[in-house]
């Protein structure tokens, strides 16, 4: 009988100062693989968030449920401390000596002003991996520039390639740069941890949203001599697309390989289109013809035909439909988490399968783990109470 695998990152200790999406996404990936992530939550930041999202008007029970829905805080411990308080800063420095990784997403220089820079903390723990996530990185003329996901997509050139309108840039409906940055940061964190464990020396990991977003242009840069040679964006291929069916529902096809394109054309009753796959002069005509055909039957009709033929296709699911997909449920990509009060809510499971992932634990309220963490440092109850506010 095979022994159960332990969580892949069991024993990795992370102190998480991050607040915006890229940092918490990075540490969520680590926590979901078993890392102990201690989320440092500043009362001032919490108050700002509560006001912006209206959480300050909720009663305690609703606040607990709302917090439990925060997927990116799932599986993390919460340490509520005022970063501006000198006693809290001293406690954090003691904690730094016991962790492997620090993650932060403040603008360059902010944590240095609190005595929590890489230089300050690596002096206490030479093997420390200190991960900084910012818009443009720790160096360069734009190092101090503020901005969120759309600014990163705009600066990186990605927005110029987004959307169906070739005359105007487009905004994606999801925070692509944020999530991509968090993923890159998680990879970089583990690379630096491997090095630290081999050498005993940590490092400052500098993650820029703009540079992570630029990786979305890798395919374009690999295919054309200059970016200007790339065709305009939008529906410029006949062999892939989004199609509206008779019932108003959408499906997607990606039959770019010749054998798939041939099968697709046969299914659509237009074998004459097979030799015209790459004929740019006929693409608009082919697309118009295909769209008219799709508009004759409901989506279920086309899904059944394509499934039988084995072509490349998918229904365009909304988020609710995606959460209910049997494929995702079977693999644990969607899990049900019990929130405070007993409500069950579907959330995303770990996006990769390593085996041994711990069961999902809903996000705890801010400060939930203060006593456990501070007692571990040897603080007395009076000190814990004073620091916890």
Predicted segments with their positions:
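Substrate-binding/catalytic subdomain of NAD(P)-dependent oxidoreductase enzymes
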Residues: 193-227
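Short linear loop/turn motifs
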Residues: 275-288, 317-324, 382-389
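Aromatic-enriched alpha-helical interface/lid elements that frame and gate functional surfaces
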Residues: 94, 234, 238-309, 313
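Short, well-structured beta-strand/strand-turn elements
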Residues: 37-40, 307-321, 380-385
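Glycine-rich beta-alpha junction loops
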Residues: 44, 135-137, 209-214, 247-249, ...
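N-terminal helix-loop segment corresponding to the beta1-alpha1 unit
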Residues: 1-201, 225, 365, 370-389
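A short glycine-threonine-serine/GTX helix/turn-capping micro-motif
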Residues: 169-180, 202-204, 231-234, 238-240, ...
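Terminal low-complexity tails and localization/encapsulation signals of metabolic enzymes
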Residues: 1-13, 241-246, 321-389
